[in-house]
């Protein structure tokens, strides 16, 4: 009887979802209804297969568009919701009680990765907000039952505060569920989570910093809160969080190339990191093509367009030679730097974040070639230099190599590199970095590789004092004793010099031409200049890799003489390296002063930084010496 009354409450209150605000939410127009309809046709076909070929969470994304476009009949919508309902874990004794399976064949009551309920509600609650009046009585009843369990599933799933995209998604879900079903206590649960999270980022920054995927997910949840909440306190908090995030994104963004620069915490594309953030939000916001085919994304984009960029954010995006320093965690030494010039930017992180981060990167972009393969360093043990392991299905092909006692969440089928110890010291357009790693459970070889991915767009390339051509397909050019590589792109010069490594004496780094061409798969865009090269050093067969490098970029290289001067600066710079008892002390004498690090790679301790321009004190998000993060978020410290 109690359960009947609760369901009746859901049914009656759900019909009037958000009616207390006294307005009906405007539904934005889709940019290409024909493309949207084609997507609906494909997804409907996938959903009807047995088993369904549409992921459970994507059914909610699908139904939002179905109801907007009136694509299905009422009975078909009921069928789809009841199909999803079979994936809800309703056993109160199950580990994942209230959650939803990701697919259609799992059983046992344990979903493993508990994030699915968060995504399902993030998408699906728009049905209640926008189209509740288009549901049949039976469809509404089914959806309300799903969300009744979902609230339990959300509460049952532990989430660490540093798991930014899911934590912020939970905030949105709690606020939306509480408001839709007129449960103020649930809204207050969301408010409390919001307060805790704002305090955390006010002190330590955004841990999932500058991710082309997950900054987009963060924006979605914050934009939805800002658009739909009827609580002025929560709306103000969302506005402040959005301002902080958009300051960050604008500082790193390359509008000409349509991509997010800087070091990346999580980047599923090792060679060119454009993803959800750029394709669905930033590029359409900035006047690029809007290829959104789902109303969910269009709702979020329309709110972002309504907010727009502030004058400060526009100026940040256009400012040349800006230097950004940002904190990204409560742990010591967790910060990243980015120097953004006109045609080049160079970025470093002082600590690894994840097995799919991009801690050392250079981005080139000009009017002639706005977008191309990025330059990125990776240390890995799969021979997966370009990060294609997942796309090529190598996890399945190499499953016979899975080690004994492999962790259940190890990500064998995913693209993975090491999470090594690292330390870096960056002074605008140059940095010195040290990386030390050991073979882990995702490696398939006894040795590790240090690789730098390069675009095949250079006007000239040099190894040491020898100008060379790009190696023929399948060939390589071996480094000489200078251990240096320089290249020129228009008026930009770049250099890499290996300062110290543990490779065998007969093992030299080399420039390889594998004939690699990148074809986007996660997002639908075309990259014309998609060819890549790589510099790779193979480390010893003991599974240990150690390397220190000096990366340098410079613009304004107008002549051969300018480039010769740049190269000689790199070759002739005094380098001092001392190694003793696992401690490496290395310094490069640059024209600006000493640049380097001192590291205890055995005990994984950062002992000292040498930098002619020390980092600002007590920074959160600092651009050119001005702190722009704390003025927004300091009021949320508790």
At which residue positions do the language-model features occur?
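Non-catalytic interaction/regulatory modules that flank or connect domains
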Residues: 313-403
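Carbohydrate-active enzyme catalytic cores, enriched for enzymes
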Residues: 232-348
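Charged, amphipathic alpha-helical segments
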Residues: 39-46, 342-349, 414-417
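Bacterial Sec-dependent N-terminal signal peptides
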Residues: 1-22
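Mature N-terminal, pre-catalytic/accessory segment of carbohydrate-active enzymes
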Residues: 19-51, 628, 634-638
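Extended repeat-based interaction scaffolds and adjacent low-complexity, acidic/S/T/P-biased segments
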Residues: 387-638
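Aromatic-lined, polymer-binding surfaces characteristic
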Residues: 51-229
């Amino acid at each position: 009887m109690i359960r009947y009354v609760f369901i009746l409450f859901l049914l009656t209150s759900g019909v009037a979802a958000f009616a207390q605000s006294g307005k009906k939410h405007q539904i934005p127009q889709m940019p290409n209804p024909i493309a949207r309809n084609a997507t609906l046709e494909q997804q409907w076909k996938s959903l009807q297969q047995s088993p369904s070929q549409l992921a459970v969470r994507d059914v909610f994304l699908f139904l939002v568009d179905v109801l907007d476009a009136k694509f299905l009949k009422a009975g078909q919508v009921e069928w789809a919701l009841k199909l999803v309902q079979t994936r809800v874990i309703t056993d109160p004794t199950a580990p994942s009680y209230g959650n939803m399976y990701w697919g259609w064949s799992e059983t046992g009551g344990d979903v493993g990765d508990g994030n699915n309920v968060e995504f399902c509600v993030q998408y699906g609650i728009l049905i209640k907000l926008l189209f509740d009046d288009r549901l049949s009585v039976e469809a509404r009843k089914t959806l309300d039952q799903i969300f009744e369990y979902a609230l339990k599933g959300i509460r049952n799933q532990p989430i660490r505060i540093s798991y930014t995209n899911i934590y912020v998604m939970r905030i949105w879900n709690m606020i939306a569920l509480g408001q839709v079903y007129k449960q103020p206590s649930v809204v207050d649960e969301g408010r409390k989570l919001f307060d805790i999270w704002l305090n955390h980022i006010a002190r330590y920054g955004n841990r999932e910093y500058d991710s082309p995927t997950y900054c987009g997910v963060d924006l979605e949840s914050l934009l939805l809160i800002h658009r739909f909440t009827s609580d002025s306190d929560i709306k103000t908090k969302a506005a402040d969080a959005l301002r902080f995030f958009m300051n960050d994104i604008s500082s790193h963004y390359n509008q000409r190339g349509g991509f997010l620069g800087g070091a990346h915490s999580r980047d599923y594309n090792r060679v060119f990191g454009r993803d959800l953030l750029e394709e669905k939000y930033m590029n359409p916001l900035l006047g690029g093509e809007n290829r959104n085919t789902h109303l969910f994304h269009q709702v979020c984009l329309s709110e972002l367009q309504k907010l727009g960029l502030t004058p400060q954010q526009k100026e940040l995006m256009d400012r040349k030679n800006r230097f950004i320093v940002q904190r990204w965690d409560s742990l010591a030494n967790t910060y990243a730097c980015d120097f953004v010039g006109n045609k080049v930017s160079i970025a470093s992180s002082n600590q690894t974040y994840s097995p799919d981060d991009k801690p050392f990167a250079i981005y080139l972009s000009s009017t002639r070639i706005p977008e191309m393969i990025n330059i990125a360093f990776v240390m890995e043990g799969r021979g997966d230099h370009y990060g294609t392991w997942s796309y090529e299905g190598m996890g399945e092909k190499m499953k016979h190599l899975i080690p004994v006692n492999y962790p259940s969440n190890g990500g064998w089928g995913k693209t993975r590199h090491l999470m090594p110890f690292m330390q870096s010291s960056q002074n605008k357009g140059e940095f010195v970095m040290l990386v030390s790693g050991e073979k882990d459970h995702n490696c398939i070889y006894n040795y590790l590789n240090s690789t730098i991915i390069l675009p095949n767009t250079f006007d000239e390339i040099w190894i040491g004092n020898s100008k060379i051509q790009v190696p023929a397909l399948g060939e390589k050019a071996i480094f000489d004793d200078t251990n240096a590589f320089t290249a020129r792109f228009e008026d930009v010069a770049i250099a890499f010099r290996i300062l110290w490594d543990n490779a065998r004496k007969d093992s030299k780094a080399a420039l390889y031409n594998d004939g690699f061409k990148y074809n986007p798969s996660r997002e639908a865009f075309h990259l014309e200049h998609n060819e890549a090269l790589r510099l790779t050093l193979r480390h010893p067969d003991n599974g240990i890799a150690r390397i220190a490098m000096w990366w340098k970029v410079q613009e304004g290289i107008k002549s051969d003489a300018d480039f010769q001067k740049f190269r000689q600066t790199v070759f002739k710079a005094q380098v001092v390296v001392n190694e003793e008892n696992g401690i490496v002390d290395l310094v490069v004498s640059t024209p600006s002063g000493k640049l380097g690090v001192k590291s205890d790679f055995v005990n994984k301790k950062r002992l000292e930084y040498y930098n002619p321009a020390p980092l600002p004190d007590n920074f959160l998000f600092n651009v050119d010496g001005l702190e722009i993060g704390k003025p927004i978020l300091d009021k949320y410290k508790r």
